[in-house]
């Protein structure tokens, strides 16, 4: 028998955790002073008069490093629970995790061969 009342705490937490930021934005939008002028449209430079354009063009290698970092950061998120329950799960899950790591190693070798990890 599926009992929905067991999830009451979850739904209460979800509603409260959604309402707090929404209310914070609404209250600050209502109570905050609105002033329009040229100072509001300029970029803030720690009290120094801004010089030049605020838009900078980043080189693509920053994005490649960030992408490789995110891939291996997500790998850590997936492998940590597996490592904590390794003795309970058995050999089949070990083989699946090994395949997962091998696929990531292939991706790392591909990025390395394409020059995504070179900083020159």
From Swiss-Prot:
Membrane topology summary:
Multi-pass membrane protein
Query: Which family, according to the similarity comment?
Result: Belongs to the complex I subunit 3 family.
Give the EC number: 7.1.1.-
Report the source organism: Lupinus luteus (European yellow lupine)
Q: Give the stretches traversing the membrane.
A: 9-29, 64-84, 88-108
Q: State how it assembles.
A: NDH is composed of at least 16 different subunits, 5 of which are encoded in the nucleus.
The record's subcellular location field reads: Plastid, Chloroplast thylakoid membrane
Q: Which GO terms describe its molecular function?
A: NADH dehydrogenase (ubiquinone) activity; quinone binding
The reaction(s) catalysed by this protein are: a plastoquinone + NADH + (n+1) H(+)(in) = a plastoquinol + NAD(+) + n H(+)(out); a plastoquinone + NADPH + (n+1) H(+)(in) = a plastoquinol + NADP(+) + n H(+)(out)
Is the keyword Repeat assigned to this protein?
Answer: no
Quote the function comment for this protein: NDH shuttles electrons from NAD(P)H:plastoquinone, via FMN and iron-sulfur (Fe-S) centers, to quinones in the photosynthetic chain and possibly in a chloroplast respiratory chain. The immediate electron acceptor for the enzyme in this species is believed to be plastoquinone. Couples the redox reaction to proton translocation, and thus conserves the redox energy in a proton gradient.
Q: What class of enzyme is it?
A: translocase
Keyword Cell membrane in the entry? The reply is no
User: What gene, per UniProt, encodes this protein?
Assistant: ndhC
| Protein name, per record | NAD(P)H-quinone oxidoreductase subunit 3, chloroplastic
**A GO-annotated cellular component:** NADH dehydrogenase complex
List the InterPro entries hit by this protein, alphabetically. NAD(P)H_OxRDtase_bac/plastid, NADH_UbQ/plastoQ_OxRdtase_su3, NDAH_ubi_oxred_su3_sf
BP term (GO), one: photosynthesis, light reaction
UniProt keyword terms in alphabetical order: Chloroplast, Membrane, NAD, NADP, Plastid, Plastoquinone, Quinone, Thylakoid, Translocase, Transmembrane, Transmembrane helix, Transport
């Amino acid at each position: 028998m599926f009992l929905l009342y067991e999830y009451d705490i979850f739904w209460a937490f979800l509603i409260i955790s959604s309402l707090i930021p929404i209310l914070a934005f609404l209250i600050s939008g209502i109570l905050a002073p609105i002033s329009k002028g040229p100072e509001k449209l300029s970029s803030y430079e720690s009290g120094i008069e801004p010089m030049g354009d605020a838009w900078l063009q980043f080189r693509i290698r920053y994005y490649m490093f960030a992408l490789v970092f995110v891939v291996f950061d997500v790998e850590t998120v997936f492998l940590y629970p597996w490592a904590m329950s390794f003795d309970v799960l058995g050999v089949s899950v070990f083989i699946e995790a090994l395949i997962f790591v091998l696929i990531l190693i292939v991706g790392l070798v591909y990025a390395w061969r394409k020059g995504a990890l070179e900083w020159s």
